[in-house]
Amino acid sequence: MKKKAQPAKVSYFFGPGWNDLKTFIKKFWEFTQEDIKKRAEKVEKGKGVMSLSGAASLLSCFSLILFGSLFFLAIAFTVSLILGLIFLLVYLLFFLHWISDRIHLIRNKIFVACPSCKSKYFIPTYICPSCGARHSDLTPGKYGAFFRTCQCGKKLPAHFLLRRDRLEAECPNCGHSLSGTGNRPLCVPIIGGRSSGKTAFITAFSCEFIERVAPRNGMEIQHYNKENHDFYEKVLRSHYLHGTSMQSKEATDIKAASSVAFSFMVHHKKMKPDRLIQIYDIAGETFVNNTENELQLHYTYSEGIVFVLDPLSIPSIRNRLDEGISEVDKSSVGTLDVDLVLDSFLNKLRQITGHASGDALDIPIAVVISKADIRTVDEFIGDEKISAYLSQNGLDMNKYTAVEDRLCREFLTENGMAHFVNAIDMKFKNNRYFKCSAIGHSRERGRYNPKGVLEPMEWIFQTTDNGMKSIWHDSEFEKL
């Protein structure tokens, strides 16, 4: 496939150099022809070829034609060979620069994940800060090994060592503005039915991680862009402080993304490159009804999946609700069948990744039972239940999450969800169960007091990213 021409000046060694060689050979041949022509004219003006001097001039002319041509060929060949070897060496150096750039991207798992169309690229479209020209392949090559000269004369870095990622960039597919193009993305979709608690989970995790986990572990946070910063301050943080939540909205504009990403970058002096955390949220109705405006391509490169399961969507639990539950919480009971949500998700995974229906997937999945502060649920999987299990079996607190995992599985199995547990085990090689209360109390009763929202994400990061594991290891994820 032919590469698109770039708005830049071609390197001397990929065009102008060969043109100069052709010009040299042409001029040298013209000089040789001119010399032969002069000798021929001298023969014509002489005493004739029958005279001694005329015969000598004719012989000299033939000698010039023969030896001049041979000399021309020898010089042209020698110059072409020397320059060809020099150019070949330069091409090898250019190739090594390109290889080093690509190895850096692959080894560090650096790529561009567009939060809008979900497309994945090694290299985005970079924008010249001087003239706004768009460069879709800003890598070492025919336009330069380390720098590329834009059509406006501005020199642009074409290698990761020169911090190419500091340039403004956009998605080559949809034109969406991009940030953190030199970072390693950690993409985690949060899936679940309507009113399962996905958005509250995202709100609680984002605020807890940014304001508590990051400072405690020496991480520096940078928001993806101004839009994400404003969304965090005016929406997520506002809900966090007031104990409210919002429903994920179905995208009514067919040009708008159905799955919305909240993104921020994490920097730590011991972790290279920086991480770009992208948390995806999608409305339950859109997810189950298969009415997304875009292919959910991020499933192909996600670090893990968080499946939020509303225990109140389980009939046996819903029928045993304690009378103390508030009307607000009653109105937010998930109505979608958990098996239907799981089937929809698995169908999408097969459609996008091409996996056969019988294949077990490598991607880790954290099944999170939400609303665990409700008394009916707490009786099965609450802290007291876990502590009692630890005590009865002589286990220390390092086994807390392992016991949590076991009790959550037993809770679902005992309440008619054995088929769901079996399906997760069959379809996902690496799975773990958690409980959480994103708000920590009934909605609209004050600031969030979340419990259990950090552990699922920490487990995913520890499982897939040694860099994050080295700087964030608040919990132990052992097995019984």
Identify the residue ranges that each predicted region occupies.
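Catalytic micro-motifs at enzyme active sites that drive phosphoryl/nucleotidyl and oxygen chemistry
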Residues: 175-177, 248-254, 263-268, 291-296, ...
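Hydrophobic alpha-helical transmembrane segments of integral membrane proteins
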Residues: 55-96
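Short, flexible loop/turn elements at secondary-structure junctions
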Residues: 192-194, 266-270, 283-286, 369, ...
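Basic, amphipathic N-terminal segments
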Residues: 1-58, 87-148, 154, 479-480
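Conserved GTP-binding G-domain of TRAFAC-class P-loop NTPases and closely related GTPase folds
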Residues: 303-480
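Conserved G1/Walker A P-loop phosphate-binding module
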Residues: 101-149, 154-255, 267-277
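Switch II of P-loop NTPase G domains
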Residues: 254-268, 272-306, 312-323, 448-451
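Short linear interaction motifs
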Residues: 94-96, 168-173, 181-187, 258-259, ...
